[in-house]
Amino acid sequence: MITNAPRACLALISLLAGVALAAPALAQDAAPVRQSLDDAWWTGPILATGASTLPKGRALIEPYLYDAKPYGAIDGQGKRHAAPSADNYGSQTYLLYGVTDTFTAGLIPRSGYRRAGGRSSSGVQLGDLTVQGQYRLARWKQGGRTPTISLMLQETLPTGRHDRLDTRPNDGFGSGAYATTVGLNSQTYFWTPNGRILRTRLNVAYTVLGHAEVEGASVYGTPAGFTGRARPGDSFNVDLAFEYSITRRWVAAIDLAYQRDAATTVSGVDGAGAAYARRSPVSQALILAPAVEYNFSPVLGVIAGARIIPAGRNTTASVTPVIAVNYVL
């Protein structure tokens, strides 16, 4: 299954496109009825963040569960090579609150468990914690051309373990560094020829990371006895997402994303006191995330799909099955 991931991805994308394109042909003999916004319920795609803010006093809870499974290592020329099998189980939960109608704040806690190389984590491990604020700059109105636009600011705190992993190499789920992300999110609506709604999101974000003090074996590949620091590379991400309303409850969704991570540098001394320096190459990844949403009501829905990295440079080809529940209180 994993080795055929790119082929499966293309099949899923073809299915999503076919749903949108086939419907007009079935309705040639009758004028399509334009779907109303009230008749379309959404959870949101797997990756792209919404530009809308919560109404004042409302809250959102959205837990994600996933398992990142590598199926190849992609080198600097974009060629894929075999990679050891592994399971990287994880969870992250969006806990958001509408402070005002135009400002939403929240937390994103993370945790994980890994099985790789014949060894497992000693238990469920905490990851880094993100604090988030989002301010809405513009709001889409039906008949208008301006999308909903918001400015997002995130600060990720290094709460997860990242070093001193000499006896438990699979316990590292943190970076050890503070990370500041600035993003611009937009969202708008289109009506397809058959009258159904196509909701579209565009996210652009840049993340600046600080230094991490490192001792011993770490997530940066340092050996036992090492003392020094690591500087993770800054990251740029752009994500274009589409959601097609099949019925009021059912939605087909897909994210098309690109991520570039700058080089990570590590410097210090090893256990023998000799100088130790490493620099990882710049990595790039093409990310696809097809999914299906089912909404029980306008405030409760579930989404299931996969985050797939089929191509890139100096990255890991992987398939990550994902399921999430979206609930607005």
Task: Annotate the PLM regions.
Residues 87-91, 122-131, 147, 174-180, ...:
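Residues that define the transmembrane beta-barrel architecture of outer-membrane proteins
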Residues 52-54, 97, 135-137, 155, ...:
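Residue-level signature of outer-membrane beta-barrel architecture
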Residues 68, 72-81, 215, 224-329:
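Outer membrane beta-barrel transmembrane domains
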Residues 65-71, 109-115, 137, 155-161, ...:
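Transmembrane beta-strands of outer-membrane beta-barrel pores
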Residues 50-58, 102, 139-149, 191-198, ...:
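Short loop/turn motifs that connect adjacent beta-strands in outer-membrane beta-barrel proteins
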Residues 32-38, 66-92, 170-171:
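Surface-exposed strand-loop-strand hairpins of Gram-negative outer-membrane beta-barrel proteins
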Residues 59-63, 105-107, 131, 147-153, ...:
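Transmembrane beta-strands of outer-membrane beta-barrel proteins
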Residues 26-72, 141-148:
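Outer-membrane beta-barrel biogenesis signature
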